[in-house]
């Protein structure tokens, strides 16, 4: 995973896609993770990763911590990279999500990160969702499972986004 090999601090959202990445990293004793994911906190409790919880109110549907306290805690930290997923990607609108509370937490994490990586499967490209999460000027990497097509490849190249599939 070259995009995170030299990173020592990371923020992660509560998406199932990012959870799969975190499982691959659990032997990294040099990594500190800031997350609002109750699942990540639980799963990584026995790992080598140093886990920092954001605190906040638990959303039982998403198993994520949310609210004012969560945003305040995130704002106290700075991370090398923030990894997140989203519900859709639109060339004109950017990264989109379906839950406003989740989007606010992710936006706070983005502000506290040097770099941002989007982990999305191929179905998210050219897909709209309810809430604007981030425009592409905030995204450094898009990691996906299949080639998204010529238009997206050119768009990422033109916007200095490293596209990995």
Regions found by a protein language model. Name each.
Residues 1-16, 22-30, 45-49:
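HTH-adjacent hinge/linker in prokaryotic transcriptional regulators
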Residues 39-165:
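Conserved phosphate- and dinucleotide-binding cores of soluble alpha/beta proteins
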Residues 22-35, 161-165:
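Short N-terminal secondary-structure initiator segments
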Residues 12-13, 35, 144:
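Short beta-strand scaffold positions
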